[in-house]
Each structure stands twice: as structure tokens, then as C-alpha cells.
UniProtKB/Swiss-Prot annotation:
This is Small ribosomal subunit protein uS4. It comes from the Bacteria. It comes from Corynebacterium diphtheriae (strain ATCC 700971 / NCTC 13129 / Biotype gravis). Part of the 30S ribosomal subunit. Contacts protein S5. The interaction surface between S4 and S5 is involved in control of translational fidelity. The keyword Signal does not apply. SMART domains: Ribosomal_S4, S4. The lineage of its organism: Bacteria, Bacillati, Actinomycetota, Actinomycetes, Mycobacteriales. Belongs to the universal ribosomal protein uS4 family.
Length: 201
């Protein structure tokens, strides 16, 4: 199954959640398309579980097969499977770039990482799904820092609010991973227990 690259607002409306962040079109019409979208049908337990999984997938830009691997790993780790799943998704390099304020959306962050603009601990990484670890140091490559986008991002970072588990140094465009996030620190509107129930069947 290919990655969805169509209008993000359409997916947001279908799943009734802003998958982009600051999507004004979704805020104007936060209901599913068609029939004015306002009439809510009675949703089965399975449908709710499926929607929650799709919400997680599209929020983080993950394919179905890849998402199953994340779930399998989350299930093997100690602790709550649902919490582990969200933490694994949040620890993706593209998401960290987005959370740090170096990209407006996760989709843009994924493109920036894919194009090789970042290093992790001095090594060039162009894999968006690369999992960061505690104490990792993420830098924008020196030649990439001259790009207009990063120059503008550098100015915006002065007023940016980043999660407590990250630190950003605006002057050098450096991201420091102080620790991996805890579930309570991740502000995504997910009911991950529904996903666990879906895969537990």
C-alpha cells in the first residue's frame, strides 16, 4: 500500500482530527466530507478501533506494514503496549525535526530528512523513520544551513516552544534529545488502547 500523498485536510475531516496541525480548512469544516458530513452514523466498536489506527498512521505518515512492525515491537517491550507504540512513533527522526520547529508539518520534516539535510551524532541520516535515542545530537548539515528555509526557521526558533524532552539551540540549529518522551508528554489526540484492542483480536 502506497503512502497517502493527497490533500491532508480530506483525511483530517474523515478521521475528525487535525492531522497536520493548524489546518484552517479543517477547523472551518471539522466533519467528514459528503452530505455536509454533519450526520454522525452509529459507529461500531471495530470501526472506532480502525479509525484510531488510521489516525495514528496518517498523523505520523506510516504505511500499514510499517505500522504493524511498530505495534509488534511495542508489544514486546515492557510496559503498556499502547504507550510504547506512541513513544516509538514519536521517536522517529522526522517527527523530532517537526517537534523541534525545523519544519511546519511532519510531511515537510519527512522530505527534509529524506533529502539528507540532517546528521545524527555527526553521521548523515536520510531515513525519516530513524529512531532517535536519549542524548542524540541532531544537526542541520553545514551546507544546508544556507538554505532560505533553514534561515527562516532559525529566526522562528527564537520564539518556538518545544517539548520538554528536547532542546533546540537556534544559533546552530542543533537539536538535543535529553530523554525519550513519556506518554504524558505527547500531545497527540490518540486513544491508543483502541489500537491495542484492534490488534489483539
Amino acid at each position: 500500500m502506497a503512502r497517502y500523498t493527497g490533500p491532508a485536510t480530506r483525511k483530517s475531516r474523515r478521521l475528525r482530527v487535525d492531522l497536520v496541525g493548524g489546518d484552517m480548512a479543517f477547523e472551518r469544516r471539522p466533519y467528514p466530507p459528503g452530505q455536509a458530513g454533519r450526520a454522525r452514523i452509529k459507529e461500531s466498536e471495530y470501526l472506532l478501533q480502525l479509525q484510531e489506527k488510521q489516525k495514528a498512521r496518517f498523523t505520523y505518515g506510516v504505511l500499514e506494514k510499517q505500522f504493524r512492525r511498530y505495534y509488534a515491537e511495542a508489544n514486546r517491550l515492557p510496559g503498556k503496549t499502547g504507550d510504547n507504540l506512541v513513544i516509538l512513533l514519536e521517536s522517529r527522526l522526522d517527527n523530532v525535526v517537526y517537534r523541534a520547529g525545523l519544519a511546519r508539518t511532519r510531511r515537510q520534516a519527512r522530505q527534509l530528512v529524506s533529502h539528507g539535510h540532517f546528521t545524527v551524532n555527526g553521521k548523515k541520516i536520510n531515513v525519516p523513520s530513524y529512531r532517535v535515542s536519549q542524548y542524540d545530537i541532531i544537526d542541520v548539515r553545514e551546507k544546508s544551513q544556507k538554505m532560505i528555509w533553514f534561515e527562516e526557521a532559525q529566526e522562528n526558533l527564537l520564539d518556538a516552544v518545544v517539548p520538554a524532552w528536547l532542546q533546540v539551540v537556534p544559533s546552530t540549529l542543533r537539536i538535543l534529545v535529553h530523554q525519550l518522551p513519556e506518554r504524558a508528554q505527547i500531545d497527540v489526540p490518540l486513544q491508543e488502547q483502541l489500537i491495542v484492542e484492534l490488534y489483539s483480536k
